[in-house]
């Protein structure tokens, strides 16, 4: 459980290690005891900024009164991310970057005060051809078979009932629908990600969750 009662949970998308965006757009609205949850591409390994190193920025976050939660996307340094200690937090496994900066691991279920959350990070980098393995791209960006199975086991354990589901990419049916909205510029041709998006379709059908 959380050590203190939260006031508000804010959910945002990719921050990509952008210190300026964090300070200007997030720091200005969040309050003590709030939670901010980043739905992947938090940017582990990419937080080196003009003024602060990555670890110094994490130290800055650790001095704040709010809690930073994030799932992984495809733009993370997974070697660095997996180097942090694994602990149990709110009933699920996490990597603790700092005491209040916490990576929610794939396939875990967390009970935070009065809500439960299932998370499934990961995604495929469509810009992989522009990146270098081990420097700006990591093969762990897509879930492993072990992680898929672990997710299903956890959902079965809670009878496929959870309040909220947090992912980085979307179920394949949603991706297809979004691709029909030409103004968004979303394509439905990333076959390398289909194992994950089809898996999320299955989760969406099986799990009872709250509408947003």
Write out the residue ranges for each language-model feature:
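Short hydrophobic/charged patches on amphipathic alpha-helices used for structural packing
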Residues: 27, 152-156, 201
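Active-site-proximal loop/helix segment associated with metal-binding centers of metalloenzymes
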Residues: 92, 99, 113-195
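Cap/insert and terminal regions of metallo-dependent hydrolase folds
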Residues: 44, 48-65, 163-211
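Core catalytic region of metal-dependent phosphoesterases/phosphodiesterases
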Residues: 2-5, 12, 18-112, 206
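Short, charged N-terminal beta->alpha structural module
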Residues: 2-14, 127-135
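Structural motif
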Residues: 8-9, 34-35, 115, 163-164, ...
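Short, flexible loop segments at the rims of nucleotide/cofactor-binding pockets, characterized by
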Residues: 12-17, 44-49, 140-145, 188-192
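Histidine-centered active-site/metal-ligand motif
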Residues: 16, 75, 168, 212
